[in-house]
Amino acid sequence: MPTKAGTKSTANKKTTKGSSKSGSPRGHTGKTHAPPSMHSGMLYKDMVNIARSKGIPIYQNGTRLTKSELEKKIRRSK
């Protein structure tokens, strides 16, 4: 009797572990979760749009401003 119970409990443990791990092969690819762009509050696109609407130039001496530079300018113009 005790041997049967013992094998049962170990078998149950194994199956629960296995199913949770191998049951979802796509679990840790990051595709199921929201894309990283969703996590950053303001996207570069949004920054450019705000800058345009406020009349802040996006380009400076031939190169495009970085997100942080745009952010600074937008904050200053507020």
Swiss-Prot record:
Biased composition (Low complexity): 1-24
Location of the protein in the cell: Virion
GO cellular component: virion component
Keyword DNA-binding: yes
Region feature (Disordered): 1-41
Claim: NAD is one of the keywords in the record: no
Gene Ontology MF term list: DNA binding
Keyword terms of this UniProt record: DNA-binding, Late protein, Virion
Induction: Expressed in the early phase of the viral replicative cycle.
Membership in a protein family: Belongs to the asfivirus P10 family.
Record function comment: May play a role in genome packaging through direct interaction with viral DNA. Binds to ssDNA and dsDNA with the same apparent affinity in vitro.
Name the UniProt record assigns to this protein: Structural DNA-binding protein p10
Organism in which the protein naturally occurs: African swine fever virus (isolate Tick/South Africa/Pretoriuskop Pr4/1996)
